[in-house]
């Protein structure tokens, strides 16, 4: 539940617009994975904020992100990327760096974002929201 709260808090901040004319594009991996994101927090936050979320599937990597930046035509707002792509994209200036306590509001209980988010992730350009592991 804490992870879901973090995701919703992040999306609430990023999408803190009250006009229904606003839309955001979220890019993810497609299939059941994207559908779970859409149903779990995309649809609820879109309804709560009265906005539209456009979902786009991609196959990973940084090439499409680089092409958008080089063309000056960035159309993606939130991107689900692997940790290594986050590190490389941040180092290459493809992503925005966050100051977690300045750029994000505190949690409902007052906890600052730097203490509430997965800020130990390998980049200042990302808010970690998906954890997984392989068990052998």
Model-derived regions: residue spans:
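A generic local structural motif
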Residues: 11, 63-67, 121-123
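Early extracytoplasmic/lumenal segment of secretory-pathway proteins
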Residues: 24-88
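Short, structured coil segments at secondary-structure junctions
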Residues: 49, 93-94
